[in-house]
Amino acid sequence: MNIQALINDKVSQALEAAGAPAGSPAAVRQSAKPQFGDYQANGIMGVAKRLGTNPREFAQKVLDVLNLDGIASKVEIAGPGFLNIFLDETFLAQQADAALADSRLGVSAAEAQTIVADYSAPNVAKEMHVGHLRSTIIGDAVVRTLEFLGHKVIRANHIGDWGTQFGMLIANLERIQAETGEVSMELSDLEQFYRESKKLYDEDEEFAVKARGYVVKLQGGDAYCAEMWKKLVDVTMVQNQRNYDRLNVSLTRDDVMGESMYNHMLSNIVSDLQTQGLAKESDGAQVVFLDEYKNKDGDPMGVIVQKRDGGFLYTTTDIACAKYRFEELGADRVLYFIDSRQHQHLMQAWTIVRKAGYVPESVSLEHHAFGMMLGKDGKPFKTRAGGTVRLADLLDEAEVRATQLIESKNPELAEDEKKTIANTVAMAAVKYADLSKHRTTDYVFDWENMLAFEGNTAPYMQYAYTRVASIFAKAGISMDSLEGEIKITEEKEKALIAKLLQFEEAVQSVAREGQPHIMCSYLFELAGQFSSFYEACPILVAEDETVKQSRLKLAALTAKTIKQGLSLLGIETLERM
């Protein structure tokens, strides 16, 4: 149950009954401090101002018709017109019992939509680097959350598998085969292979001519070029899948929807834009002029959809892509997890898409932009030599550091268990350090912070789960064999339950806003509430069996909520660390 939404509806009804215009926002939020109740309605002052009435007097009118029977024990008018809402203890206990009995922990299923999520999108013939990390893990966390709510999610890994660079790659592949009769296509060699191809293209005119010829042949469907191109794609995706599997990211080869997939649509789209009068010839190119964007002279900005040589641009592909996702995939929402520097490019493509009628306004096109990963010097994260950090190297280092950490904390563990724990902690640390930051901000990558057992980190959250689970292991009790009802006898129990019952609010916020840090913050606060409860309320040595069973139920619901929340982030838990 989403208690915030329930109370918001009740306050909205009361607002209208008290004379507010229909649809006036109740603006119910979680209270910042316990003395202000569990929830606070903040919308009354704004409505009173529009009505020209005293906010506190209007708040009293709302309170007179507000029906929170069985939900709130007390509602107070505070300040200039806030409503502080204190939840009823019986209501809280009943909802906690219901959540524990439910495999979904009380989270209601949403009205199912078809949602396309575009994320990760590495380039072919190049290794994944740290710049791909944010799109990959943020997108995957949101996808997992949407699926948990019951949506049909189509993962779209929009890989860079097309373009003029493939001419030089195929030409170099042919050169190596002619010289050696064999070519190793291990991806560790492919990064070097790409650099070598580029050098030849830049410095050897004969090679460059051949490469440009292969571009034309590949675009024309030449069988040999297509075979070489497919080999490059296959080799790249095998290596990428290793990274996905290590990171516990749910993408597979079946989710690849590369740029090449839309090639057959591009010429028809340009023709249609011309027919609609949207695309016009300008200096030999086909250009769409957008009044919504101005150039430096204040004139409508021109967006090229076809170059004078007949070639198409990324914008053309993105127009086709959005059209395909609506017409062929039936998308209700399309989420693009692409870095913030691409924002104007996407907005221009979507403006054209809307003007052309390819995607109706009822379908939501959303750019979930993200900031950069920075080094401690505040500059983009690089190797010591100033080069790009390979993602695989970053994950290797995380495992080495986590192994040292586990060795220092628990040296008596068996080697195989040590390795399992270290690998799980390593991947969790890399992911959580990113996911716990607001998506749109840059963040500093810091090994010491991300592997710390204090603060809002993966090791802390994994240990929080292990600590709760150990209560049951110590007592030899199963979380699923508890009896009796939850009873609130202490203030710390009530505070823990109130936080536990905010789980659905966190889940729905992540799904709506594409912001996984909301879940991280929620889980961190929950772990803190459990610590306070654990210190104040004895569990296994409680004064009687009824209280013991009730507190064990709260511990079980805490463990299950942390485990489920971390799972939605793509992070695994451990029974012991």
Swiss-Prot record:
InterPro entries: aa-tRNA-synth_I_CS, Arg-tRNA-ligase, Arg-tRNA-synth_N, Arg-tRNA-synth_N_sf, ArgRS_core, DALR_anticod-bd, Rossmann-like_a/b/a_fold, tRNAsynth_Ia_anticodon-bd. It is found in: Cytoplasm. Signal peptide: none annotated. The keyword Cytoplasm applies. It holds the Pfam family tRNA-synt_1d. This is Arginine--tRNA ligase. Monomer. Keywords: Aminoacyl-tRNA synthetase, ATP-binding, Cytoplasm, Ligase, Nucleotide-binding, Protein biosynthesis. A motif ('HIGH' region) lies at residues 122-132. It comes from the Bacteria. Its main location: cytoplasm.
